[in-house]
């Protein structure tokens, strides 16, 4: 548990104006100090489907029962095929909290009905809307190396797991993670705003050197009953994030994203700079906030990747380098850390990616064991 200095919380003191918030954060900090040993980790199920896809990345809770989707189940996207080549995974599995696994979608790159530059390699970018649409990012490779990585797209699937549309273009370049403000209804109407991190802007050409081309793009969708989502606008709201290719991780750059409870901030895991930043007014801004404002840096963070905002506003992230999960208050105070995976050398490195909070619990995927797990 670590405190950060005054510079790191600059610009965020307004979040703490209410006494209620201060008291709540104090309670969270006290609980984190006293409850650590009582936490348990339970393996729910393997994430490996029949075709052998591995390396689970994205995870999201199904918000509404429709088609093949069952409310409360978890959808998980796989980044690797059975060959263990990164950027070749083609499946999304659905797992119930009791551990029953079914195949939600197998997206055949040889028979893709839509445009997706380079093919299929499903990333952490995964959302499920109340209207039944599932949207997943693709950052494909042909041989598992960054040399063959291509721009990909966002694939839009219906509630039966069938691809009906793709979102692509110059602003979509290696979609790595994603969250959404869902204003859709169960009958299919309404709207949604997607927030996508992109990590391939100049990275492949730099051959491992750091470039500052990572972006966060807002995609405004109009949803109509009986029709595929319609893209009304795409806006770069964050830019200049550090990114580079990596022989082990394929690519490193801005990863997890999550909206604050009031929608006034979009938190971004700035992995290479080992910090969490906030982009102000993400739902309405029409220009880039560059890399936003630093919420917290260093401390227990160690290559923050997946990010999720809990109902109480606390920011949960998982580290790529040591297997720890870190909890950070909106003020920037790191209130707790827990080790979710200690396997490998160094312990926990490369094991964690996607996570989602449900009440007082956290579901997360473990790449080292190819499993869905529950922390509570």
Model-derived segments and spans:
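Bacterial N-terminal signal peptides
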Residues: 17-28
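Loop/turn-rich, solvent-exposed surfaces of beta-rich toroidal or solenoidal domains
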Residues: 271-275, 294-338
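Surface-exposed loop and turn segments in beta-propeller and other repeat-based domains
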Residues: 34-52, 97-120, 156-175, 222-225, ...
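Structural signal for beta-propeller blades
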Residues: 84, 92, 154, 203-204, ...
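Beta-propeller blade signature
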Residues: 89-98, 149-161, 211-222
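Short loop/turn segments immediately following the C-termini of beta-strands
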Residues: 79-81, 138-141, 149, 183, ...
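N-terminal secretory signal peptides that target proteins for export/translocation
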Residues: 1-14
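Beta-rich, blade/repeat-based domains predominating
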Residues: 48-72, 87, 108-134, 140-141, ...
């Amino acid at each position: 548990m670590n405190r950060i200095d005054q510079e790191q919380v600059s610009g965020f003191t307004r979040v703490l104006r209410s006494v209620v918030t201060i008291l709540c954060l104090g309670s969270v900090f006290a609980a984190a100090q006293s409850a650590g040993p009582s936490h348990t980790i339970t393996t729910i199920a393997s994430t490996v489907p029949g075709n052998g896809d591995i390396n689970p990345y994205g995870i999201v809770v199904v918000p509404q029962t429709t088609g093949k989707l069952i409310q409360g189940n978890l959808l998980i996207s796989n980044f690797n095929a059975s060959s263990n080549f990164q950027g070749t995974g083609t499946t999304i599995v659905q797992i119930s909290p009791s551990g029953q696994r079914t195949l939600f979608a197998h997206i055949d790159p040889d028979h893709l009905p839509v445009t997706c530059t380079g093919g299929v390699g499903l990333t952490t970018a995964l959302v499920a809307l109340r209207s039944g649409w599932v949207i997943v990012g693709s950052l494909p490779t042909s041989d598992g190396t960054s040399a063959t990585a291509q721009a990909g797209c966002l694939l839009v699937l219906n509630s039966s797991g069938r691809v009906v549309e793709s979102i692509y273009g110059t602003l979509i370049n290696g979609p790595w993670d994603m969250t959404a403000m869902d204003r859709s209804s169960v009958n299919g109407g309404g709207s949604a705003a997607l927030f996508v991190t992109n990590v391939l802007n100049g990275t492949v050409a730099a051959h491992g050197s750091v470039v500052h081309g990572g972006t966060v793009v807002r995609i405004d969708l109009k949803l109509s009953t009986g029709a595929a989502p319609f893209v009304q606008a795409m806006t770069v709201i964050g830019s200049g994030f550090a990114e580079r290719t990596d022989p082990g991780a394929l690519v490193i750059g801005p990863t997890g994203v999550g909206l604050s409870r009031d929608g006034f901030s979009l938190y971004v895991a700035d992995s290479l700079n080992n910090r969490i930043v906030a982009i102000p007014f993400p739902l309405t801004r029409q220009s880039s906030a560059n890399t936003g404002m630093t919420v917290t840096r260093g401390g227990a963070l160690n290559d923050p990747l997946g990010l999720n905002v809990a109902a109480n506003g606390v920011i949960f992230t998982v580290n790529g380098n040591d297997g720890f999960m870190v909890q950070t208050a909106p003020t920037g105070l790191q209130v707790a850390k827990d080790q979710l995976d200690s396997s490998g050398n160094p312990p926990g490195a490369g094991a964690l990616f996607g996570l989602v909070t449900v009440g007082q619990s956290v579901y997360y995927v473990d790449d080292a064991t190819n499993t869905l797990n529950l922390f509570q």
